[in-house]
């Protein structure tokens, strides 16, 4: 069996990229399994995680960042051109590789149209975010785009979510399955719970909501002065969060 994963790039040490590395390496080590990973904006940068030598990579070299200029008209034209280029290059690889399953990690542009490619493979969306992250987007145009995308999910063979709660949030769709993230280690000892400390671990980005955690902690801290909050992680909002902490 051959599986192809689609993801924009693997240049950050983030959760989704880590899970992809874990699963791809595991699958590539199984007898009779082939794994291919397709990016479109890797830009010759090194991979953030180690991957098995058995895994093959393609980069489609599509620079969607060029569609974010000041001229709205040319942005639209470029987006159309780059999308067509993306579709053509990806379909060429799928027809060449003949995968059994093609997966979109749901952060790339291909999620909008992957189901339309007629290469014969099963098309799967793999969601690593909560349903509500798609519901809480700001702006009329962005909300319209999200609604349009959500209406396309029914055309995919499967939508993979992480938990039973996620499955319920997505509603009554027959093509939803639950596959939790892999656990690569299990603690040998349990904490003795003697230290009054809360630890939060994650990428310091808007998606993780550390700003809300800090705001809530500021309200409850006076009632629990012995407790400490420790945030572990890095990301684009580190300076902003440090200023919020003061």
Write out the residue ranges for each language-model feature.
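N-terminal strand-loop element at the rim of the active site
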Residues: 6-13, 26, 30-77, 169
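Short hydrophobic "strand-cap" motifs at the C-terminus of beta-strands
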Residues: 6-8, 162, 182, 198-207, ...
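A conserved mid-protein helix/loop that constitutes part of the nucleotide-sugar donor-binding site
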Residues: 14-22, 196, 200-219, 236-242
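Glycosyltransferase donor-sugar binding loop
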Residues: 37-45, 201, 228-241
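Short His-centered aromatic/hydrophobic patch
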Residues: 86, 104-110, 127
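Membrane-proximal helix-turn-helix segments that form the acceptor-binding/catalytic region
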Residues: 88-92, 140-159
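Active-site proximal beta-strand in glycosyltransferases
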Residues: 101-104, 115-134, 160
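Donor nucleotide-sugar binding/catalytic pocket of nucleotide-sugar-dependent glycosyltransferases
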Residues: 149-188
